[in-house]
Amino acid sequence: MPKMKTKSAAKKRFKITGTGKVLSAAAGKRHGMIKRSNKFIRNARGTMVLAEPDGKKVIKNFLPNGL
């Protein structure tokens, strides 16, 4: 059976750390910033670590060979 391919969209959106955690950009920053609090905008600026169950799903289904 051939190897499962890595999803190209997932390569661009997620990064796996050395310890196996999955990093992604914070959500909610596309539009509508005027009604968001300054704290929300500041916290959503960088990357965030996905919850462990979500990270395992991403690795299993979309990034089987890592990055």
Curated annotation (Swiss-Prot):
In the record, which residues are listed under signal peptide?
none
Q: Which SUPFAM superfamilies match?
A: L35p-like
Which InterPro entries is this protein grouped with? Ribosomal_bL35, Ribosomal_bL35-like, Ribosomal_bL35_CS, Ribosomal_bL35_sf
* MF term (GO), any: structural constituent of ribosome
> Entry's PROSITE patterns?
RIBOSOMAL_L35
**Claim: Ribosomal protein is one of the keywords in the record:** yes
Keywords from the UniProt entry: Ribonucleoprotein, Ribosomal protein
The record's comment on protein family reads: Belongs to the bacterial ribosomal protein bL35 family.
Query: PANTHER family recorded for this chain?
Result: 54S RIBOSOMAL PROTEIN BL35M (PTHR33343), LARGE RIBOSOMAL SUBUNIT PROTEIN BL35M (PTHR33343:SF1)
Q: Which HAMAP family match?
A: Ribosomal_bL35
User: Which NCBIfam families did the record assign?
Assistant: rpmI_bact
The protein depicted here goes by the name Large ribosomal subunit protein bL35
